Amino acid sequence: MGIRVGIDVGGTFTKAVAIESASGALVGKVTVPTTHHAPEGVARGLVEAFSSLLQRTGIAVGRIDLVVLSTTQAVNALLEGDVAPVGVVGIGPRAHRKEAFRRTRIDSVQLTPERRLPVFHAFLDAEELSEERVADTLRTLMARGARAIAVSAAYGVEDPEPERRVLDVATALGLPATAGHEMSGLYGLEVRTLTAAVNASILPRMAETTRWVEQSLATSGLQVPLMIMHGDLAVSPLEEARRLAASTILSGPAASVAGALLYHKLLDGLFIEVGGTSTNVGVIRQGRPVMKYVRIMDHPTCLRSVDVRVAGVAGGSLVRLRGRKLAGVGPRSAHIAGLPYPCFVPPEMLSNLRLVTLAPRPGDPEDYAALEDDEGRRYAVTLTDAANALGLVPEGDY
């Protein structure tokens, strides 16, 4: 009997589950910490979860006929600002240069109240797209700080050839790149440009992750194609995430909604999932997930997805201080900061603690709260710890 495996790479934990293909019966499940800081990135935790699942259940690799991945890597990259600066190349006919320039120009993109995506803009006349001119433009954008390219041409949905020329040159220069026509066939130059920029900003992270995943799982003897879930509940080969990374922005939440529909048989309901890094809230209506176009802050995109609100606050979110007063929570989590939760540490280790502040990652504000002991060991201050300290968590739960 065939086995299907689902693996979810979250911001804090990576989960793997096996079910029988015919009946849908649960065979086994495992949870391991997500390995952000490993040389292989989150792929190491994914492989650890997969290997542990096979060991715990005794499933032979040859019985597996499908492996589907879901991930919050893309949405967490946006929430936490772990994105690549983008160079936007606008293209338009000389006769409409001023209009096309204005509609493709993006100064920066607000990702969260505190984080913006750096964007650098350049414009090319459609009549002057020589390889040399395009290459010079891309090198100039790189010199300004761009690490990925988004190209968006007026009338690109009708004639994508100008965008393809820029993509070819970007590839030759080793730059990850996205074109507006790849993101949508809909009209709306501004929205296509923004969506392409967001996609380009997470291409480096997703390309690295997918490469490590493919290489790592190949060593296990797995012969079936690896698939990934998109935000609209579609499933495609994993290599699609290298090109259309933004389509996986709500991959994790979409998988959760699909699970709720499959196992709870809901007709109408509100779906809430609290993870370690982010919290998802979605709606199920008449037995179907509500669908809409994704918005990033106040920015509309071309990405159609399940209607899920993602908040950068969850069980592992770090508390932030202004002076001695609470200033906020998140988006950084204890896992990203590499700090243990005090409520899971033996009480005898938690003595002579003092409150300090720190920056979880280079470039972060130094206003995240932590506890430090006399030996310099530090512990996170998270919502999970606060709930336990306040007695809100029943004995035996966590």
Enumerate the predicted regions with their spans.
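N-terminally biased helix-coil "hinge/interface" segments that flank
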Residues: M1-Y398
